């Protein structure tokens, strides 16, 4: 008799980021363990800058591992390989195949998140043999002064955006949102976005890590913090129109405010 599947719990995986903080450990009580090449385990404390907790990921690297039940120790990739449509349903399986189609994370944004953009499915498939990356952010907590940058506050040209990235003035044309707990924002492929300080986010996205970093708030000029930029590679996939405000839904913390 075939064993019955059950609700799975997965072991979270920490991702260190220069803009991260300690909220994932302190507030969400995450227990992160890292292993070195020799198999030695280290528990990450709240002194480590952790920007992301990968809760459910089928990415080929750092795949989520089942923590409970008789399938404990198996990865989500192995579950999909074995149980196919029993995991996601026949329609979803027929469309996406053996890769679990969602990547679910928690984000602790304690400093400036780079200005970035993601490709759509068509561009990602043609250029990188990958899914694109549409994502939804749910604001679990927002400290006073926290900001999200989503799209532009007016239409800009590709040349103006390119020049502003090099001049360090890109924030002048970004649409600014002062988020509150419970807000939801849909970040479509092509939407330039970033965030700054004091945000705890639940992120649900397509199963892709296709991120093009466009501007990194000056970190690129410091050898200690420099990360690769992809401005030339991504300049033609950006949506340069003003941000569509219907992509942002205010949460209950706004009350009756307009």
Which functions belong to the PLM regions below?
Residues 135-137, 194-219:
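A short hydrophobic beta-strand segment most commonly corresponding to one strand
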Residues 123-124, 145-150, 156-161, 187-188, ...:
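Short, well-ordered, mixed-charge alpha-helical segments that flank or form enzyme active sites
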Residues 174, 190-191, 257-258:
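Generic recognition of flexible, low-complexity loop/linker segments
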Residues 156-186:
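Active-site glycine-rich loop that binds ribose-phosphate moieties when present
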Residues 1-156, 216-257:
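Transition-metal
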Residues 115-118, 178-197, 204-206:
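Conserved metal-binding segment of the jelly-roll/cupin
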